[in-house]
């Protein structure tokens, strides 16, 4: 099966990002037909709003702090004909402007519409499912693409940079959404997560508001190890 990016609905998903209008204008200059969902509280509800807006079986989300590479529109993804794609989310890497990390955080995502309409994650997650309370990636079947076709600009203000660092400081310190004891932190946490966590806490002081991102990551890690609740990763949304 071939999935042509240009044939999918593309939705700009923004909440309160200080650079949202600037980034939306940039997206419209590249994708004039892009749709938009703005200001919906809760990650689960916001993604459902995207799905309800779309007319295609799959849709692509562009986060409010993102700008895309126009080459993305020319991409075609080859998928296994025998694979069940009804729960598969295709995730591209995004490059973080603060510290240069390139991974799934902030990257473009291609979602199956019906799955999104029926999923229960974040604020709508079952209380017995700690994984879904923190992120989408452990309940859905993620197909991670190594290519990066977007840049995350999450340092327009000190608050935005701090929040970006804080959320990653929390999430990268968890094991599939669950807290790791201090004794097991370095043995149970994936080495890639530890590397990215180190970068978030050490790199970026040379860019605007980068020190705030570093502080946020350190505070997020500290709270996770000492005071963690399942709401910690969402504290920055309020």
Task: Give the residues covered by each predicted segment.
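Phosphate/pyrophosphate-binding loops and the adjoining catalytic core of nucleotide-dependent enzymes
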Residues: 173, 177-206, 211
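Conserved small/polar residues in nucleotide/adenosyl-binding loops
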Residues: 228-233
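Short glycine-/acidic-enriched loop or helix-start segments at secondary-structure transitions
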Residues: 21-22, 70-73
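Short aromatic/hydrophobic "clamp" motif used to bind/position activated sugar donors
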Residues: 59
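Conserved catalytic core of nucleotide-sugar-dependent glycosyltransferases
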Residues: 73-173
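The conserved acidic donor/metal-binding loop of glycosyltransferases
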Residues: 63-67
